[in-house]
């Protein structure tokens, strides 16, 4: 017998969106708004009590700009990362929907919702710097609807409004897609995503300006951690550790911190290549992208696992400083790209052709970040011409990507990543034959 599946509709326009846009429409005193913008993450929370009834379904819709992480009663919701996907915010902003029936506690129970907001490309990576090229769209903001349907047919709604509480005095002191993330564990907020937390010193969330774009459901695959890689080469040079993961990729490094003193600063620098002797990173091709993550220890680390949340890097090599007795098994590279299925493989007796195929596969995977990018590492990472046409509702027909999504945002990938790679591979063989 087949398992019964549930199907539902998202909000159909403004009439069904009860939540308000909330956040804080200004920088805080410690933030920087210049060519290397530094804006701390905003943390928002609310608590509510369910009715003394049995819950049938609970569905949550939210748009967190530029990026978000969602928690209910201390549990992170979903395995997506860097969500929602970027868009031309002047035309479209994307929301995600989640079935949270299992996470919401019924029967007159206390519940809590917590949302962390990152900057993404909404509050852009470079403020007051070439706005014609890298526009900014405002400060991070949230809109949320939680719809709880009880077995008796009644409905309870929890919406984002000015009753929510907000703080920017949390551990993510800065997040910037080009430059990386600064995380200060001394400023962690404890059980802020669980009911009963004392948020009396937090600010009241503001009702903030609306984004220009139309709010639409995200129908494309979310970005996820799709693979993990262990270090291929691990070497120490004085107080520096140089790690080669053996493959160029896009994502970040997750580090396990056994013990550390409060205030110790672990620095993780990323690069695609090293200098000739292999002892130093070569970051010249990154241009102004700093591609560095910082973790400031609180002294309570006990095999603490950490990675950045709202930035990613194109890299193969990593330099780690500020952490004594680092071991290779303390590090793992998490490879991030759109959740596209592999529907085939290629292998032949020619090693060069196999390598061409693998390189093409990795290149395409690294550049699928909600929209196809031109690169995942330097201070650009912009969509190509085709993507801009998709964003504007145009249609670009080619052998790999054919049809705009119904929301006019981007392509529907009819053929998955490995199919795209195969077509590129065939094209390369054709070129080689013609050259001969």
Regions found by a protein language model. Name each.
Residues 390-400, 436:
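Well-ordered alpha-helical scaffold segments within catalytic/enzyme domains
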Residues 413-417:
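HEAT/HEAT-like alpha-solenoid repeats
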